[in-house]
Amino acid sequence: MLHTLHRSPWLTDFAALLRLLSEGDELLLLQDGVTAAVDGNRYLESLRNAPIKVYALNEDLIARGLTGQISNDIILIDYTDFVRLTVKHPSQMAW
């Protein structure tokens, strides 16, 4: 399943998101959700321990001036890759 986090993790039920993640799921951080990828924050540590791949939309990182602050554990993608993820995962959950 593809999970998309478009809101700030501080404004989301992040604990519920973590509970619903399963091995093999993928999480895409976009819009304000990219703040979860900033190195050193508590949400990133939880994502590192989850059995998933985590992506961030590079355009949203650039728009927020965060490109130099993102953890190396996060896979940066563009809109074409975003489309590929949505095609790969017929089931999606938006947060």
Curated annotation (Swiss-Prot):
Iron recorded as keyword: no
GO CC, alphabetical: sulfurtransferase complex
Pfam families xref list: DsrH
Assembly with partners or alone: Heterohexamer, formed by a dimer of trimers. The hexameric TusBCD complex contains 2 copies each of TusB, TusC and TusD. The TusBCD complex interacts with TusE.
Signal peptide: none
Keywords: Cytoplasm, tRNA processing
GO BP, sorted A to Z: tRNA wobble position uridine thiolation
Descriptive protein name: Protein TusB
Assigned protein family: Belongs to the DsrH/TusB family.
Compartments it resides in: Cytoplasm
Described purpose of this protein according to its UniProt entry: Part of a sulfur-relay system required for 2-thiolation of 5-methylaminomethyl-2-thiouridine (mnm(5)s(2)U) at tRNA wobble positions.
PANTHER family per record: PROTEIN TUSB (PTHR37526:SF1)
InterPro entries listed in its UniProt record: DsrEFH-like, Sulphur_relay_TusB, Sulphur_relay_TusB/DsrH
